[in-house]
Amino acid sequence: MGMLAEQADHVIGVDTHRDSHAAAAVAARTGAVDATTTIPADAFGYKRLLRFGRKHAPARRVWAIESSGSFGSGLTSFLLAQGEWVVEVDRPKRPARRNGAKSDELDAVRAAHESLQREHLAQPRARGEREAIRVLLITRRGAIRARTKAINQLKALVVTAREELRHQLRNTPTDELVYRCSRLRTLPSHSTEHRATVLALRHTARRILALEAEANDLETEIENLVKRTVPQLLDELGIGPISAAQVYCSWSHRGRLRSDGAFAMLGGAAPIPASSGQTIRYRLNRAGDRDLNCALHTIVLTRLQHDPATRAYAARRTAEGKTPREIKRCLKRYVARNLFCLLEATGPHPVTAPRPPRSRVIGHCS
């Protein structure tokens, strides 16, 4: 059933949910189901599940956990701390139900079978400082999006305001508009509509300023963590603290991804053939981790503006008939390879239990 069957005697598939987890112990050689169980998703349940694994899979065992970064994160951290071997599996494709049959334990069996059929299995992402950076990135991203939404709302309020207000604020740059609206005042002689509009503009502008301050504070904290964890990324041309943080969070730790090609595929930067006849083309990859893809795109745009070597490359490829989109795709693939090799050589190791030996990293790293 694949390479995993050669390294383990049992696979314990786990279907994770918010309040409970279902598990199934499956023989790696035959795929036979030895036992199933369901536990609460808490510390007591994790201990029960570990005892279940030791009882029904006493020899070499591996835990194949769905959603190890969300509903299964607590269980994954617990098992790794206990020295267990854990792999991450995507949600398996659900087959057509027979007579309406469906249960969490059946899903756990499918997760185990899915892991046995795959040639490559991912390790769970590291926690610790990487997880700290990840949650700060998510929070900052939420603040930025909320700020953008509030700015759009502010401009819409200006458009519909009465002429005496609209005349004061129209054609004003965004930063100045926010500042002026945050300091608007009313007089008792103003109409009810005027006072209400000013109140709405003032509160919206102050919300924008608060969100901007929040995003700046979070960026400072992210930068401090990046400097402490992967400072080498900041030495690369065109990489700021936010891009470096996203690249590190997506990569996670040494050995998690088997090659620079896998990292590029994760970031949606791997070429997808779209050739026909005498025309050799590659199209954009719109799958993968879009936040990582955004970071790679930002790095490429910065280098196109400030790096003479990148600009010379773009000019040469343009002369060869490549479109700007194709050139950026090529550059993103190069950046992905460069950063992967840098992190594999100098990045942090995972603080997890030992696993069976992996083959060497495949790619163009030297």
Q: How should each PLM-predicted stretch be described?
A:
Residues 1-366:
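A detector of single, family-specific signature residues
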